[in-house]
Amino acid sequence: MNSIEKKQLLGLDLNQMEEFLLGLEEPRFRGRQVYKWIYQKECSSFYEMSDLPRSLRKKLDEKARVSIPRVLKQRVGKDGSRKFLMELDDKKKIECVLLPQSRDKKSSYTLCLSTQVGCPIACSFCATGQSGFQRNLKAFEIIGQYLGSKKELSKRLKSPRAELISNVVYMGMGEPLLNYDEVIKSVHMLNDPRGINLGQRRITISTSGEVAGIKKLAQENIQLTLAISLHACDNSLRDQLIPLNRKYPLEVLFPAIEDYIAFTGRRVTFEYLLLDEVNMSRNDANKMVKLLKPLLANLNLIPYNEIEGLPFKKPETAKIWQFYQWLQDGGLNVSIREERGSDINAACGQLRSDYRR
């Protein structure tokens, strides 16, 4: 039996895993054992599953596979950030990033996951969209980024600690809510207490404003954080920066956000890239205060990370703090995101499906 015909076990939930083992004429508890080996120990080799009978390991090797994406290359930034170039079964390539929670390089990490190969949104400031869109990722490929990153991190830091990755953000390559079903499936897999056991409130899904997905997410009863990539507070500018705004302009997007907050009771995070001489005027600040002040919301300001071939520039520090002060004076709950990973092109908007530097 070749690898194409083998059953992909990565991506199965516990019930599905147990049913698969029952189909191999094995007791149900063997499914629980295999499930733990995959999701708690990042194990992709059946022969390393030491508490399984040798005969079962051989049977699994003949009939199943666990395809954790292969790490082709890793880059480590000065701040301890780690960017992984990973290869999928069909040779497509994606990137994901581990960001340290603090600069001591000994803390836990936030993992930034990709959900698509490329991105169809084609935001004008973003490296990912410049490469075009190829396909959606399956849930097992999304979870595989978590398992592959954690395995690599544990190996390099020589630490098996389960808490090495304490938070997950769906902010890598792609628009998560355009791959809705697979993303939500991966969220449930991350959260499963019998497997990875990552708390729902440690998970963030970021969207450029996919209103249909926001409406569906409000019905899921998942206590995650929704982040909105805003970047402009009027339609004319946002149309230029985020083409999706032409489908879902602000007067459509914000009622959906208000409904989401009302239905879930969860605070929404807004992300705002600071683009020098583009979206940082006093008028921009006033518009943002008017939009966000009525909402249960946090605002993260993100100084732009410059990308070769794109015209946008990072603002000077004084301009950043002036804009911050206007927003704070307007009564917003605002913070400036500390830069992570920019020296290895791993910061916001810098991910591609290859290494160009």
From Swiss-Prot:
SUPFAM superfamilies, sorted: Radical SAM enzymes (SSF102114)
Cofactors: [4Fe-4S] cluster
Reaction it catalyzes: adenosine(2503) in 23S rRNA + 2 reduced [2Fe-2S]-[ferredoxin] + 2 S-adenosyl-L-methionine = 2-methyladenosine(2503) in 23S rRNA + 5'-deoxyadenosine + L-methionine + 2 oxidized [2Fe-2S]-[ferredoxin] + S-adenosyl-L-homocysteine; adenosine(37) in tRNA + 2 reduced [2Fe-2S]-[ferredoxin] + 2 S-adenosyl-L-methionine = 2-methyladenosine(37) in tRNA + 5'-deoxyadenosine + L-methionine + 2 oxidized [2Fe-2S]-[ferredoxin] + S-adenosyl-L-homocysteine
GO biological process: one example: tRNA methylation
Location of this chain's protein in the cell: Cytoplasm
Residue numbers annotated as active site: 95 (proton acceptor), 348 (s-methylcysteine intermediate)
Residues involved in S-adenosyl-L-methionine binding: 174-175, 206, 229-231, 305
Protein name: Probable dual-specificity RNA methyltransferase RlmN
Annotated organism of origin: Syntrophomonas wolfei subsp. wolfei (strain DSM 2245B / Goettingen)
Gene: rlmN
